[in-house]
């Protein structure tokens, strides 16, 4: 039988077909988060390249990364450093702060009805420790109704912060945006 036929039958039955262990563990980790109720994703980042790659994977996999605009988007942009973008992906630059990430998450949660979940890519630009950012991310994940998926790629240079996020806060990290994106599209 053709794999696409089997995948279609499984999808109709609510079964997610995975083709390797990495895909399986990533899909399982996504299931550990609140259910995504739609196909509209906000990609939030301080690193443009990974956001573009994730956006491409999501779009190619059937998810939408809708453009964000209007007065609420303008209000959010005014709270970010010059050069930032809120069009989606939302890029608040390598110098972006935990406070600014909080503004972005709050806007996606409360102001942008065309967003169903958030993917936050936050590594380490090497400018400052990430403790405050990961603490804020943990708190927002507790309070937001829309799922937030942390993509924390800097597993070497901020390993202590990521270990705390995983081991002490009980969170899951998706260290690679494209693997995460492909898994999210399967669900």
What are these regions (language model features)?
Residues 126-133:
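Glycine/threonine-rich flexible loop motifs
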Residues 1-66, 135-187:
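Peripheral docking tails and interdomain loops at the edges
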Residues 37-116, 120-123:
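Short glycine-cluster motifs
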Residues 12, 89-92, 125, 168:
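Conserved short-loop catalytic and cofactor-binding motifs
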Residues 25, 101-105, 134:
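Short, well-ordered alpha-helical scaffold segments within catalytic/effector domains
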Residues 123-125, 150:
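Short, glycine/charged-rich beta-strand-loop motifs at protein surfaces that mediate ligand recognition
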């Amino acid at each position: 039988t053709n794999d696409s036929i089997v995948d279609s039958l499984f999808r109709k039955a609510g079964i997610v077909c995975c083709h390797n262990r990495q895909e399986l563990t990533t899909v399982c980790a996504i299931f550990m988060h609140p259910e995504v109720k739609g196909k509209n994703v906000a990609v939030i980042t301080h690193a443009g390249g990974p956001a573009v790659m994730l956006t491409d994977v999501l779009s190619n996999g059937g998810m939408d990364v809708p453009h964000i605009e209007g007065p609420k988007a303008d209000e959010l942009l005014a709270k970010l450093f010059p050069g930032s973008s809120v069009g989606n992906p939302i890029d608040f630059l390598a110098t972006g702060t935990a406070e600014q990430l909080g503004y972005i998450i709050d806007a996606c949660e409360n102001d942008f009805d065309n967003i169903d979940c958030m993917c936050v890519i936050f590594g380490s630009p090497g400018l400052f420790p990430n403790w405050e950012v990961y603490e804020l991310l943990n708190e927002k994940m507790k309070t937001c109704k829309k799922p937030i998926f942390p993509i924390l790629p800097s597993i070497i240079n901020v390993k202590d912060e990521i270990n705390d996020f995983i081991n002490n806060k009980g969170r899951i990290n998706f260290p690679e945006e494209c693997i995460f994106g492909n898994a999210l599209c399967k669900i």
